[in-house]
Amino acid sequence: MSVSIQDFGKSTSGQTVKLATLKNDFIEVQLLSYAAIIHRIIVKDRKGNPVDVVLGYDTAADYELNTDSMGAAVGRFANRIAGAQFPLYEEIVHITPNQNGNCLHSGLHGFNHTMFDVALTPGETDSVRMTATSPAGTDGFPGNFDLTIQYSLAKSGLVIRYGATTDAPTVCNMTNHSYFNLNGHASGSALGHRVTVDADFYLEADTASIPTGRKLPVKGTPMDFTEEKTLGLDIGADFTPLTDCCGYDQCYVIRDSGLRHAAWAVGPETGIRMEVLTTLPGVHLYTANFLAPVTAGKDGAHYAARDAVCFETEDFPDAPNHPNFPDTTLLPDKPYSSTTIYRFDLAEM
């Protein structure tokens, strides 16, 4: 096991971006201090060859300029808030709209656009800790919001622990927006990936991907991943949630509670299997339908729509506007914490 921190490059404003590397005999993870980005996850395929399974860029500036939050920590409220406003006790909080009058991923200055401080975790030999603050009023959100993300390397996976505090009531929903291709980041379409999602329901959403508040059953629909199937099997079905989003882009309601399995995916060409575990109530399955063509990805790679799949563990989108959803209010005396694990092994083929 080894952990190191070194310079990666400069941001567009001239700030130094750090690269943290966590490595053992099976897996190597590289993280950036800009947006707490997961830059590389390298695991061995069934032939013993190293494979980088996340899409990304070679420079800090390219990460800054991309609009897809590639690999980034997203918050203070990930996903969408309808009408860029929400009730908080006796007030209506107005935040920055940045997508069709709604707020996506916290507006213009979320953590996916923030420089973090990074350091070795005191007393531990397998992790780094990243910290950042979103000042009160950033994009309209109340409260000074202090975020800590601890990235730890387990024997076969990456453990992400989020912790947040505030000095005034606000809202919180953290996720990571890595784009996975288990055949290798430069291998093209991910639609051949075999996927399972441990959810009997998904959140109904309107044409702007705003939840209606209803949970719909997956059984008998193309949304059903309770039994393993390829991403491409039903993605072209004449089914409103798929046609509205040009593919999968929905929040699934994970069974049970606590730290438990949420999803699995297998890259058929490498045999690499990824298991997603989380303490959060939802996982957003996104097949990179709107990924803009990239001609300068990592290692000279070209990326296009559907070349990856995201498993964004999360609280429910637009939760502050839906009293029937799990509460996402963050209070000064009620710190936020959640855990997500990406665990890797080799599937039987």
Give the ranges of each region predicted by the language model.
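An exposed, glycine/acidic-rich loop-and-rim segment of catalytic or binding clefts
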Residues: 1-349
